[in-house]
Swiss-Prot record:
Organism listed in the record: Lodderomyces elongisporus (strain ATCC 11503 / CBS 2605 / JCM 1781 / NBRC 1676 / NRRL YB-4239) (Yeast)
Superkingdom of source: Eukaryota
Family, per entry: Belongs to the LOT5 family.
Record keywords: Cytoplasm, Nucleus
Protein name in the entry: Protein LOT5
InterPro entries, per database record: ICln/Lot5/Saf5 (IPR039924), PH-like_dom_sf (IPR011993)
Disulfide bonds: none
Region entry Disordered, spans: 156-176, 222-244
Location relative to the cell: Cytoplasm; Nucleus
Bias kind Acidic residues: ranges: 161-171
The UniProt record lists the keyword Lipid biosynthesis: no
UniProt GO BP: mRNA cis splicing, via spliceosome; spliceosomal snRNP assembly
Length: 244
């Protein structure tokens, strides 16, 4: 059973969170074992606009994003609360060529509607990080591409338990409702390893949104409604547990 989405009232801070590069530099011998005492932050944005979609209890369309090894957090500084979202509950994350992140998330406490999923389009703003209140963002305040790659890496740390049924479910799964004008444009190589966040290659393709299925040289990750990740035809399916 996948973990549930939680409403939280404390955001990650320098006391309970360590940045990925700092953790790796200080703990190379146990880099693959994880750290139970602190969150490990792979990416984020201190000022992100919610372009479309709404979240319960959020009064403004501004938020902060934390891409942690354990979960994905959307935080409202104005309201003093946020949502801790397990990666198993993120059915799709994709990168739009306009610089937006497109997310389809399980509607578990996120929205008051009866819809099964919540769709969000988020636009990170890479303004002067020194003006941000959370010190974590003074060193790690990424754009959409940085956050996308961080989500790829962290999502790969949380494979689904029912891998033996994955192939059968792949053939029966209906496609997600991706806007028709967002077509595949580029493929971004990402092995899922923790040390390749800044080591990727972009190849030219068609116009529109970068989106794919599974792990490997893709630009989008999809999970089905049951929490399973589906690998596209011909693409390697890598499941790495670098940190837990």
């Amino acid at each position: 059973m996948s973990p549930s989405i939680k409403l939280i009232h404390e955001q990650p801070n320098v006391e309970n969170t360590i940045l990925y590069h700092a953790y790796r530099a200080s703990s190379p011998a146990r880099f693959s074992s994880g750290d139970d005492d602190k969150f490990i932050m792979y990416g984020g944005s201190g000022l992100c606009s919610i372009i479309s979609g709404t979240l319960r209890n959020f009064t403004l369309d501004q938020c902060s994003i934390f891409v942690l090894s354990s979960c994905f957090i959307i935080w409202s500084e104005t309201d003093g609360l946020g949502f801790e979202i397990p990666y198993q509950s993120i059915y799709l994350h994709a990168l739009d060529d306009t610089g937006m992140l497109y997310l389809q998330i399980e509607n578990n406490r996120l929205h008051e509607s009866d819809e099964n999923t919540v769709e969000l389009r988020l636009l990170p703003n890479q303004e002067d990080s020194s003006s941000l209140s959370n010190p974590l963002f003074r060193e790690m305040n990424g754009g959409a591409l940085d956050i996308y790659h961080a989500m790829n890496t962290c999502s790969a740390m949380h494979p689904d338990p029912d891998d033996e049924n994955e192939e059968e479910e792949e053939h029966s799964e209906l496609p997600l409702a991706i806007p028709s004008n967002w077509l595949e444009k580029e493929f971004i190589a990402n092995s899922g390893q923790a040390d390749d966040l800044n080591d990727y290659e972009i190849r030219d393709g068609h116009a529109g949104m970068s989106v794919g299925i599974g792990y490997g040289p893709i630009a989008g990750i999809k999970r089905d409604a049951g929490g399973d990740e589906l690998a596209g035809s011909g693409l390697p399916n890598k499941r790495n547990r670098t940190l837990q």
